[in-house]
Amino acid sequence: MSSYANHQALAGLTLGKSTDYRDTYDASLLQGVPRSLNRDPLGLKADNLPFHGADIWTLYELSWLNAKGLPQVAVGHVELDYTSVNLIESKSFKLYLNSFNQTSFNNWDEVLKTLERDLSTCAQGKVSVALYRLDELEGQPIGHFNGTCIDDQDITIDNYEFTTDYLENATCGEKVVEETLVSHLLKSNCLITHQPDWGSIQIQYRGRQIDREKLLRYLVSFRHHNEFHEQCVERIFNDLLRFCQPEKLSVYARYTRRGGLDINPWRSNSDFVPSTTRLVRQ
């Protein structure tokens, strides 16, 4: 269990509780979770973070009424900056989006500006939103993470409790390499409900070569770990930076959809540009 799982800041969340669904606009449904909850135990301070990045959300179940009462549908793309005070709790985000369902807006731009305003207020940080008509995305190919997949290893694993022990002495030789490694075996659990979260992860770095078996064992050790998506990515970035000491590092995870939302956090200390094309499980 994470050291802050019972923190008072989490007590008021609707997550894990029975809730009523509202279909008229209500910004108060949004709930934030302080990023400091997981950053403080990692020694990460808001004024001296070792990374930049964003939490990228895809909104698949977004609908409202136009001025004449005709339902509208869109796919939304949201980017929440890493410097925001809070991350957005996903169940509250879903409930908030449902409140648009029977609400009339004059035009698409009003919807976009409403989303940006409410999300930035909840997160206490910078948020950008884009809305896409379905015909803009139809025929979009399924993407893939560029890099070498490390999953097909003939190894025995019998421990699924989170530990950084696998990263001890996990670099080999003195030669500096630059490579991108990918795993589709990332599985963690919701901090509150302990429901499984499934993801693919891309790790791009420059530095002494990281032992792929040790890295895979470390990633698999998240299997019983309870944290939100964004927190897991920051933990992985921090652990790799601490133990492997690469010159450059980027960590990007794309998680499968739940409640019409997928969350795709990335953190980097280089000029990394994340691909936003959905993966095969998304």
From Swiss-Prot:
Protein name stated in the entry: NADPH-dependent 7-cyano-7-deazaguanine reductase
Keywords on record: Cytoplasm, NADP, Oxidoreductase, Queuosine biosynthesis
Its job: Catalyzes the NADPH-dependent reduction of 7-cyano-7-deazaguanine (preQ0) to 7-aminomethyl-7-deazaguanine (preQ1).
Quaternary organization: Homodimer.
GO CC, any one term: cytoplasm
GO MF term set: preQ1 synthase activity
Pathway where this protein functions: tRNA modification; tRNA-queuosine biosynthesis
Compartments, as annotated in UniProt: Cytoplasm
Organism: Shigella dysenteriae serotype 1 (strain Sd197)
HAMAP family xrefs: QueF_type2
Record-linked NCBIfam families: QueF
Active site residues according to the UniProt entry: C190 (thioimide intermediate), D197 (proton donor)
GO biological process, one term: queuosine biosynthetic process
Alphabetical list of Pfam families matching this protein: QueF, QueF_N
Keyword check for Magnesium: no
Sequence similarity: Belongs to the GTP cyclohydrolase I family. QueF type 2 subfamily.
E.C. code: 1.7.1.13
Binding site for NADPH: S90, K91, R258, G259
Domain of life: Bacteria
